[in-house]
């Protein structure tokens, strides 16, 4: 059984103040013609002490952006650069969002409330700073499904429809508008460090390293790691652990993010910013999510490679502070860390106890053969073979020594897994777009959360000690 987030008192803690002078710009939210509450995360609002807000108060804070008590007096648009499809872009930053508030959750973690679609900023360039309502709905679906599947992800905290007609090239237009608030474990990206390196702000680079170590604490590097006492090296090891686990969690979930640019890499290892995402309809390493990913750079099977490449850019960004050798040593841990995370997470989703990397790898290889030859998607495969049921041949033999986990939840006997394939996503959106019927979406969220209960507690994301 999976536990709900631990409730908490509202505890504001604006740690970003320590680095805001070089990391952010104060901005103002757009004024919208209407504010209709469409989604409120009733699991996570309690975890940050905001569950007692009335809907009217909710809209005032998350649709009109009146500051929360004792929190940031003005929103902050964060500065960063990034490699986008491996082309360096120095002209980006928070172009349609900002950091709105920071507070502690029931476990004592510092969490951020950030926005998407809240208006223009100094980094909007020619864009309008808005989010389509469909984009907001897709964020709900992606984050709820990923959280259920054990991925370390941001949470969609609020969606408010804002009453504007938007023109978009990738949606039938005009289309409805929204503003989203996400709950995230930080908003510091690899691209945040890249910008400081590009501008040769080495003192600020060191300040940001210290901020991340203090704000998002993690374990020390291995005893034999060169340079392990250097702050930048400690952070490099922690981020490598976190992102290796993220790569594995995407693969086990059968999820394709679509735009794994360095500005979309959170140093806490948390997945966020969901645009053209897709789930696999069948096991296919070459499957892509984004129509504009014509070379397959961010295809399903290349996601670990993409994330490791991004870590290489992180190492380069830290190079003004330390020598290359200890950074390379940290980066070289990615492969083994990824393999171990794959084994741990694959066994968890399959409903068997891990027996160590060697035995687990045999299960993974046999499972991939079954999915590939049977043209099965991960959702169907993991559901059919939960705890070893229905396994035949090499898969049955590979799983025979693994202890099955609990399959008593009635979800496992209903005959059909929850999934998030594109046809269902479009059907859910059509109900909203054509009839303003939100019931199918809310019902889907309920079913996803029920699946999470059946799956039980997911493996803990590594690289954190607080």
Give the residues covered by each predicted segment.
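Active-site-adjacent bridging/hinge elements
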Residues: 14-20, 111-122, 209-213, 282-292, ...
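Regulatory N- and C-terminal appendages and interdomain linkers associated
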Residues: 1-80, 294-466
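An acidic intrinsically disordered interaction segment
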Residues: 105, 109, 272-283, 385-400
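Short, mixed-charge, low-aromatic patches
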Residues: 1-3, 15-19, 97-101, 163-168, ...
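Short, contiguous strand/loop micro-motifs
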Residues: 28-30, 128-130, 233-234
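Hydrophobic HxD+1 residue recognition
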Residues: 259-265
């Amino acid at each position: 059984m999976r536990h709900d987030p631990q409730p908490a008192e509202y505890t504001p803690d604006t740690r970003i103040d320590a680095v805001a002078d070089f990391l952010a710009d104060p901005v103002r939210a757009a004024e919208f013609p209407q504010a209709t509450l469409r989604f409120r995360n009733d699991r996570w609002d309690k975890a940050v002490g905001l569950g007692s807000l009335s809907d009217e108060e909710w809209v005032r804070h998350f649709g009109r952006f009146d500051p929360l008590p004792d929190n940031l007096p003005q929103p902050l648009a964060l500065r960063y650069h990034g490699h986008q499809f491996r082309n360096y872009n120095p002209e980006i930053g928070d172009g349609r969002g900002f950091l709105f508030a920071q507070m502690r959750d029931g476990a004592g973690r510092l969490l951020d409330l950030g926005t998407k679609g809240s208006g223009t900023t100094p980094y909007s360039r020619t864009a309008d700073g808005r989010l389509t309502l469909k984009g907001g709905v897709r964020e709900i679906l992606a984050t709820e499904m990923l959280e259920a599947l054990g991925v370390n992800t941001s949470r969609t905290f609020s969606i408010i429809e804002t009453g504007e007609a938007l023109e978009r090239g990738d949606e039938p237009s005009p289309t409805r508008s929204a503003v989203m608030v996400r709950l995230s474990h930080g908003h510091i990206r690899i691209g945040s460090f890249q910008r400081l390196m590009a501008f040769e702000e080495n003192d600020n680079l060191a300040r940001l390293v210290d901020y991340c170590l203090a704000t998002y604490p993690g374990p020390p590097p291995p005893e034999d790691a060169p340079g392990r006492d250097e702050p930048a090296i400690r952070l490099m090891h922690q981020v490598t652990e976190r992102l290796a686990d993220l790569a594995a969690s995407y693969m086990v979930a059968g999820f394709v993010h679509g735009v794994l640019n360095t500005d979309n890499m959170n140093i806490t290892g948390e997945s966020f910013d969901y645009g053209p995402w897709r789930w696999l309809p069948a096991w296919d390493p070459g499957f892509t999510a984004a129509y504009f990913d014509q070379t397959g750079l961010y295809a399903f099977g290349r996601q670990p490679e993409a994330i490791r490449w991004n870590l290489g850019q992180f190492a380069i960004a830290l190079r003004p502070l330390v020598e290359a050798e200890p950074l390379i040593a940290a980066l070289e841990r990615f492969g083994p860390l990824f393999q171990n995370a794959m084994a741990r997470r694959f066994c968890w989703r399959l409903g068997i106890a891990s027996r160590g990397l060697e035995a687990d790898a045999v299960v993974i290889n046999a499972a991939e053969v079954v999915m590939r030859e049977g043209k099965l998607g991960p959702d169907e495969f993991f559901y059919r073979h939960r705890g070893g049921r229905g396994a035949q041949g090499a898969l049955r033999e590979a799983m025979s020594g693994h202890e099955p986990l609990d399959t008593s939840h009635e979800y496992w006997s209903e005959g059909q897994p929850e999934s998030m394939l594109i046809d269902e996503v479009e059907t859910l959106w059509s109900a909203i777009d054509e009839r303003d019927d939100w019931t199918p979406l809310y019902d889907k969220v309920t079913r996803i959360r029920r699946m999470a209960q059946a799956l039980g507690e997911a493996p803990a994301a590594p690289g954190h000690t607080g």
